[in-house]
């Protein structure tokens, strides 16, 4: 199929697979015939990119080397339905020509969305310390000709230096070793850590929006951008991993108001959620 027809066809195939009953699919995959069929299906889908079928990033291309039929986020990515509350928050707060920092960018879904929203005069600084995810991020930047996205293969924290990163089979759950060992940990990587304050002081364009998804290290990221917050008041969109009370305390102390993006439940009483924090007034 010429042009974009084949990526679109692969996208429909992925989405069709997700409509099958989950329990039956799992039982089928356990059988030898099912495993062989899944492997064959994966080879077809992996033969080239797929087109995102909906949402704010509809029409963008995904590299299927970053996806498998068992990838926990694969179907949300292909449907364009990944973390809709975060997508909507970016839509509301990323204006044309904005600068967005994507901290914990993974393979780049939100970096691409931020680039689309900010337009050709915007800038997206994407931070991803895990080599495999950073490679997927670079492929997505190239595949979509996202020239305003810059990829930084580093972690972001409270202090510059180096630290150990627990690499987990499901890449989106990898985290700094000081946060504890995940049961699916496959290895430990030595990574560079930078702070947002250091980057801005060194000449990087200051952010108007900072999106944070760092599997428990979100308070460290905030501590490392205290001066940037004071000087530039960026909008903060953050996934919380048990740090709800501390996030509220930190944002309140710097004159921000935080709200739960995922529902009406107060942040302090919620579990793992996405939060939005804005300068009060």
Regions found by a protein language model. Give the residues of each.
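S-adenosyl-L-methionine
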Residues: 1-140, 144, 203, 269-281
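Glycine-rich adenosyl-binding loop in Rossmann-like folds that engage adenosine-containing cofactors
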Residues: 57-88, 147-148, 152-205
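Short, glycine/acidic-enriched loop or turn micro-motifs at the edges of active sites
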Residues: 105-107, 131, 156-158, 214-216, ...
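Hydrophobic packing residues within well-ordered alpha-helices of enzyme cores
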Residues: 114, 137, 141, 165, ...
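Acceptor-substrate binding/catalytic loop of class I
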Residues: 131-132, 186-191, 237-242
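Short, hinge-like loop/turn segments at secondary-structure boundaries
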Residues: 142-144, 166-172, 248-257
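Conserved acidic-Pro-Pro-aromatic motif
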Residues: 198-281
């Amino acid at each position: 199929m010429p042009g974009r027809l084949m990526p679109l066809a692969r996208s429909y195939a992925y989405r069709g697979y997700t409509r099958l009953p989950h329990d039956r699919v799992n039982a089928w995959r356990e059988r030898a015939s099912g495993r062989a069929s899944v492997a064959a299906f994966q080879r077809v889908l992996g033969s080239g990119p797929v087109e995102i079928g909906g949402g704010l990033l509809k029409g963008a291309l995904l590299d299927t080397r970053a996806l498998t039929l068992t990838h926990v986020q694969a179907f949300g990515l292909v449907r364009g339905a990944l973390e809709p509350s975060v997508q909507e928050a970016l839509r509301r707060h990323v204006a044309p020509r904005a600068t967005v920092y994507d901290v914990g960018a993974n393979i780049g879904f939100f970096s691409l969305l931020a680039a689309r929203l900010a337009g050709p005069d915007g800038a997206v600084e994407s931070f991803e310390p895990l080599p495999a995810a950073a490679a997927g991020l670079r492929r997505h930047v190239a595949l979509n000709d996202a020239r305003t996205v810059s990829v930084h293969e580093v972690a972001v924290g409270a202090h510059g230096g180096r630290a150990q990163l627990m690499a987990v089979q499901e890449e989106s759950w990898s985290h700094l070793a000081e946060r504890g060992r995940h049961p699916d940990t496959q290895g430990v990587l030595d990574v560079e850590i930078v702070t947002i304050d250091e980057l801005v002081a060194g000449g990087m364009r200051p952010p108007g929006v900072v999106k944070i998804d760092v599997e428990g290290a979100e308070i460290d990221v905030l501590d490392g951008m205290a001066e940037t917050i004071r000087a530039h008041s960026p909008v903060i969109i953050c996934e919380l991993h048990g740090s709800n009370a501390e996030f509220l305390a930190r944002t309140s102390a710097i004159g921000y108001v935080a709200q739960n993006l995922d529902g009406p439940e107060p942040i302090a009483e919620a579990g793992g959620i996405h939060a939005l924090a804005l300068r009060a007034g």
